[in-house]
């Protein structure tokens, strides 16, 4: 107690001014303090630890520490055959497992140089866009609850449940689907799936617009996110950002449009970038808006696929799948537009084994999180929650 009093006395100077008046000068300088957020913290969206250096309430540096969810995916991929890797891929970005399977199968099929049945291509895009909407609903709902808005969280998970039911009906699983296989799919759509999906599209379109209004017209939500975590477009490109993070900085880049795969070239959709009317381009609010706009675009793509998809007529989605996959010697990089950005797989084959020599995953979450120092510098400690939520990380993909 005595030491505290001495410290206070040293920081306060009383200067006599005459006539009984004095001037009190206070030394308000502060020392740098290190603050840990996580790995068990409600704002980190998983087992992430941020080591924050702070000057008072202002963050001067934030260093992310990773690896708490490391599960040796890339090493496992070297001892499992090509089809057996699909369930491991599911467990990377478990909120968008269909999209992860799609990216991996694109890479292997590129190495095999096989042609995919046209109906399967439409099936893949439908389930991937459904999963994209479900993933964005989790991102928006948890972002809202991070900032204190509970009602949008309930709305998001209410509507997400419809998608989970559709994907479970198609694949037999609610999350880790193992549905998109190399050369095809595990099952054809069940009877009535097309009609039920069309019903969902009609149901959810007004709900998606309602959700946009619920948050973007909320004064508190806007004040917590607008101008927070700014990222200029050139810096975003230099960091290797992709997906909603890059588009939130005003860069119009989407693999489905600019490096198209599957049947995306046949679909009419626009790349969502903020216009600057509701947000400062490059801030946390812009990244949120991109995800909100993308859900509406995904509905349009699903609708187009339902109209164009060939009829089943006894179709077997496993017809083009080889019993034993042994690609020719070579290497390949395949990528797809995941809800969080570009997910890519670099695969090396020796031409002899049914297992890859090397399978390297390019995680969009890992790349996006690498810019945490840039995003957090000069921000207040409470605003770190808004910044982390705007990145929309899944630690299963970051740590692998």
Swiss-Prot record:
In terms of Pfam families, this protein maps to: Complex1_49kDa
| Catalyzed reaction equations | a quinone + NADH + 5 H(+)(in) = a quinol + NAD(+) + 4 H(+)(out)
Organism superkingdom: Bacteria
Under which EC number(s) is this enzyme classified? Answer: 7.1.1.-
Any one Gene Ontology molecular-function term assigned to this protein's record: NADH:ubiquinone reductase (non-electrogenic) activity
UniProt enzyme class: translocase
Location(s) in or outside the cell? Cell inner membrane
Q: Does the keyword Transport apply?
A: yes
Q: Which GO terms describe its cellular component?
A: plasma membrane
Topology term for the membrane: Peripheral membrane protein
Q: Which family does it belong to?
A: Belongs to the complex I 49 kDa subunit family.
Q: What does this protein do?
A: NDH-1 shuttles electrons from NADH, via FMN and iron-sulfur (Fe-S) centers, to quinones in the respiratory chain. The immediate electron acceptor for the enzyme in this species is believed to be menaquinone. Couples the redox reaction to proton translocation (for every two electrons transferred, four hydrogen ions are translocated across the cytoplasmic membrane), and thus conserves the redox energy in a proton gradient.
PANTHER family in UniProt:
NADH DEHYDROGENASE [UBIQUINONE] IRON-SULFUR PROTEIN 2, MITOCHONDRIAL, NADH-UBIQUINONE OXIDOREDUCTASE 49 KDA SUBUNIT
Q: Which NCBIfam families does the UniProt record give?
A: PRK06075.1 (NF004739)
Q: Assembly and interactions?
A: NDH-1 is composed of 14 different subunits. Subunits NuoB, C, D, E, F, and G constitute the peripheral sector of the complex.
The protein depicted here goes by the name: NADH-quinone oxidoreductase subunit D
Species the sequence originates in: Prosthecochloris aestuarii (strain DSM 271 / SK 413)
């Amino acid at each position: 107690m005595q030491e505290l009093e001495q410290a206070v006395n040293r920081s306060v100077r009383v200067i006599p001014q005459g006539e009984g008046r004095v001037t009190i000068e206070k030394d308000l300088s502060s020392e740098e303090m290190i603050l840990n957020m996580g790995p068990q913290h409600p704002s980190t969206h998983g087992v992430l630890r941020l080591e924050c250096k702070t000057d008072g309430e202002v963050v001067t540096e934030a260093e992310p520490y990773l690896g708490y969810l490391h599960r040796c995916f890339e090493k496992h991929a070297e001892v499992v055959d090509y089809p057996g890797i699909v369930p491991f891929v599911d467990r990377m970005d478990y909120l968008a497992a269909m999209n992860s399977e799609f990216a991996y199968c694109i890479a292997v099929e590129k190495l095999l140089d096989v042609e995919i049945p046209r109906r399967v291509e439409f099936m893949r895009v439908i389930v991937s866009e459904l999963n994209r909407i479900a993933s964005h609903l989790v991102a928006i709902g948890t972002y809202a609850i991070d900032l204190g808005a509970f009602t949008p969280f309930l709305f998001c998970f209410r509507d997400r449940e419809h998608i989970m039911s559709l994907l479970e009906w198609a694949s037999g699983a609610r999350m880790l689907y193992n549905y998109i296989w190399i050369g095809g799919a595990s099952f054809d759509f069940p009877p009535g799936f097309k009609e039920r999906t069309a019903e969902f599209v009609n149901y959810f379109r007004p709900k998606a617009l309602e959700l946009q209004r619920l948050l973007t017209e909320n004064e508190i939500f806007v004040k917590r996110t607008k101008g927070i975590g700014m990222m200029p477009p050139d810096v975003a490109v230099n960091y290797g950002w992709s997906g909603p993070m890059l588009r939130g900085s005003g860069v119009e880049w989407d693999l489905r449009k600019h490096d198209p795969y599957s049947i995306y070239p046949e679909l009419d959709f626009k790349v969502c970038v903020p216009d600057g009317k509701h947000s400062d381009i490059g801030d946390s609010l812009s990244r949120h808006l991109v995800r909100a706009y993308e859900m509406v675009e995904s509905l349009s793509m699903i609708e187009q696929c339902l109209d164009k998809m060939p009829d089943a007529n006894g179709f077997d989605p496993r017809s083009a799948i080889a019993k034993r996959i042994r690609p020719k010697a070579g290497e390949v990089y395949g990528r797809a537009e995941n809800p969080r950005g570009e997910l890519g797989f670099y695969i090396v084959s020796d031409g002899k084994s049914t297992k890859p020599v090397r399978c390297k995953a390019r995680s969009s979450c890992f790349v996006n999180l690498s810019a945490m120092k840039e995003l957090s510098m000069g921000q207040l400690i409470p605003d770190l929650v808004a910044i982390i939520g705007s990145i929309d990380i899944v630690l299963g993909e970051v740590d692998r």
